[in-house]
Regions:
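Two-component/phosphorelay signaling modules centered on CheY-like receiver
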Residues: 11-31
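Hydrophobic/aromatic residues positioned on beta-strands within the core alpha/beta folds
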Residues: 79-81
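Acidic di-acidic motifs
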Residues: 8-9, 83
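CheY-like receiver
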Residues: 120-131
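C-terminal output helix
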Residues: 104-117
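Conserved phosphotransfer microenvironments
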Residues: 52-69
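Alpha4 helix (beta4-alpha4-beta5 surface) of REC/receiver domains from two-component response regulators
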Residues: 64, 83-100, 108
């Protein structure tokens, strides 16, 4: 089960994403945050596998976010989540693993989260016998 932190300053959107994530047994929503201060505290305390991060979340310049988060949890998968499609290039340049536009259909959002989590699992599994 992949442990997910959901970070967005819009409570309605957090609620919708929570309901969406709860439809999948492979995800465990371990925490929610509404600003970067809470994100940093939750990441440090809970050590999630993945964060769905509102790219415009208040609290810290975007150019520092991914590096600060990975300093706390090196294996953390970062999904940049934004209403602005033009943020995609910036998100990847700053180290995000996946970009999701908030206007995308729920099935696409779930698929992207699932793919990045499966990618981590396949990298962690050895491809040779363990004799």
């Amino acid at each position: 089960m992949k442990r997910i932190l959901l970070a967005d300053d819009n409570p309605g959107l957090r609620s919708a994403l929570r309901l969406l994530l709860e439809t999948r047994l492979e995800f465990e929503l371990i925490a929610e945050a509404c600003d970067m201060e809470h994100v940093l505290a939750q990441v440090e305390d809970a050590h999630p596998d993945c964060i769905v991060l509102d790219w415009e979340l208040p609290g810290r310049p975007t150019r520092e976010r991914v590096s600060v988060l990975r300093a706390l949890v090196p294996h953390l998968k970062v999904i940049a989540f934004s209403v602005r499609e033009e943020s995609e290039q910036d998100a990847f340049a700053e180290g995000a693993d996946v970009f999701v536009c908030k206007s995308e259909p729920p099935t696409i959002i779930l698929d992207k989260i699932q793919k990045i989590c499966q990618q981590e699992e396949s990298l962690a599994k050895p491809t040779y016998p363990l004799d």
